[in-house]
Amino acid sequence: MATKILALLALLALLVSATNAFIIPQCSLAPSAIIPQFLPPVTSMGFEHPAVQAYRLQLVLAASALQQPIAQLQQQSLAHLTLQTIATQQQQHFLPSLSHLAVVNPVAYLQQQLLASNPLALANVATYQQQQQLQQFMPALSQLAMVNPAVYLQLLSSSPLAVGNAPTYLQQQLLQQIVPALTHQLAMANPATYLQQLLPFNQLAVSNSAAYLQQRQQLLNPLAVANPLVATFLQQQQLLPYNQFSLMNPALQQPIVGGAIF
């Protein structure tokens, strides 16, 4: 009797265990590499280790942060290469004309090459051209400084003509150096022609040549103003070379004794 009761209890236990039991599917044992094919990425990351998730997140952030500067650098390098290519093409296009200019006029070629690198040329073209013209007259300036330092210093001072038109000013200064010598040579070689050139500029010389000569001697010699005899002597000395008869016969040129004067 007791054996039957134990057998019934065992059967009841088996029935209860059979109703509560469940079967584990084999797909749950699949590797994690197959999971992303059936689940979204976030769900697949959830099955991974937290350290692996943090590492993969750092890789994604670093790639996104470095991608934009690299693209900008690539664009800048492409733009620089494009500009360099255009400049090279333009240089090759103008190279024959520049070579011809260098052969024909080296000064103009060098001036054109230095024009862009000169701040004065970019700021004030007129001043730069004036400076270039002044450099052409540097030999004349050096000669003027050696012959007459006073005039050279005057040129360097604040002269309106020197600042406005340096070549014209230098030409006038050189003429002032040459004209006295030419005038002196003309007066020594041909006094009549020299006086004839001076006559139209003085009414006294036109009306009375003797008085004009006397006036010039009085202006040049203060002793003639104080002593009329000296003025007469100088007048005679001035008029003596213009006596045609005495010029033809030097024996008739009687010297004047100066003892009575002094």
UniProtKB/Swiss-Prot annotation:
**Annotated Pfam families:** Zein
Q: Which UniProt keywords apply?
A: Endoplasmic reticulum, Membrane, Seed storage protein, Signal, Storage protein
Q: Where in the cell is it found?
A: Endoplasmic reticulum membrane
Q: Which GO terms describe its cellular component?
A: endoplasmic reticulum membrane
Residues spanning the signal sequence: 1-21
Please give the Gene Ontology molecular function terms for this protein. nutrient reservoir activity
Principal localization?
endoplasmic reticulum
Family to which the UniProt record says this protein belongs: Belongs to the zein family.
What exactly does this protein do?
Zeins are major seed storage proteins.
Question: What further note is attached to this protein's record?
Answer: The floury-2 (fl2) mutation is associated with the synthesis of a novel 24 kDa alpha-zein storage protein and an altered protein body morphology. The 24 kDa protein is expressed as a 22 kDa alpha-zein 16 with an uncleaved signal peptide, resulting in an enhanced Lys content of the grain and a soft texture of the endosperm. Structurally, 22K and 19K zeins are composed of nine adjacent, topologically antiparallel helices clustered within a distorted cylinder.
Q: Protein name, please?
A: Protein FLOURY 2
Q: Quote the gene name from the UniProt entry.
A: AZS22-16
